[in-house]
Design a protein with these regions (language model features):
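ATP/Mg2+ or Mg2+-diphosphate-binding catalytic cores
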Residues: 2, 10-14, 131-180
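An alpha-helical support segment within catalytic cores of ATP-dependent transferases
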Residues: 6-48, 58
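Activation of the activation-loop gatekeeper triad in protein kinase-fold domains
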Residues: 67-72
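Active-site activation/catalytic loop segments of kinase-like enzymes and analogous catalytic loops
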Residues: 78-111, 127-142
Length: 180
């Protein structure tokens, strides 16, 4: 998900200057909070598009498989959780509890370090920035394709809210709820 170059290059596809500033804000957060510690984050090939449209469930509503491997990439392992969470938190009234709950479940299968968990919010916001920027780009190419914008409005609402939040405090709360 370290597709910051895509954001830098394509943010001009976003029509609102105010929204472009939101993208720039989260790029700065990434530079300030992720780049200095990036060498300490584990990397692997990840699916990179875990959302409710890409999970196959059986008749008992249990996950049976995943589809859409077109976004697979070698990147930070924490991004797998961040991508899934990005689509869950945008409509959740308590994203901190939801994030902690998902991370605790993930920890049972694939343990993450405290450092990785502490930076997940930056990756959640970055994923949503990529999502809205990609939507702006693709809308120009395929104006009749409504799927392109399926989460765009909710993502912008979440990003605007998170721009006003102390992300370090948010991160500390997630770490505390995950480990205590």
């Amino acid at each position: 998900m370290a597709q910051t170059q895509f954001l830098i290059t394509n943010q001009n596809n976003i029509r609102s200057k105010e929204d472009q500033l939101i993208i720039q804000h989260f790029l700065q957060e990434y530079e300030k909070n992720i780049v200095p510690i990036s060498h300490d984050l584990h990397r692997a090939v990840i699916h990179n598009d875990g959302n409710d449209h890409n999970v196959i469930v059986n008749k008992n509503n249990r996950a049976h498989g995943i589809i859409d491997f077109g976004d697979m990439v070698h990147t930070y392992i924490i991004c797998e959780s961040a991508v899934c969470l990005a689509y869950l938190v945008i409509n959740n009234p308590d994203p901190i509890d939801l994030t902690s709950e998902l991370i605790r479940a993930y920890q049972k299968v694939f343990p993450l370090t405290e450092l990785e968990i502490s930076v997940i919010i930056y990756f959640i916001c970055l994923r949503l920035c990529i999502s809205v920027t990609m939507a702006a780009y693709r809308k120009q190419l395929f104006p009749d394709n409504k799927y392109i914008t399926v989460t765009e409005d909710q993502a912008w609402i979440f990003l605007r809210k998170m721009k006003r939040v102390d992300l370090q405090r948010w991160s500390d709360q997630v770490v505390n709820k995950t480990f205590h």
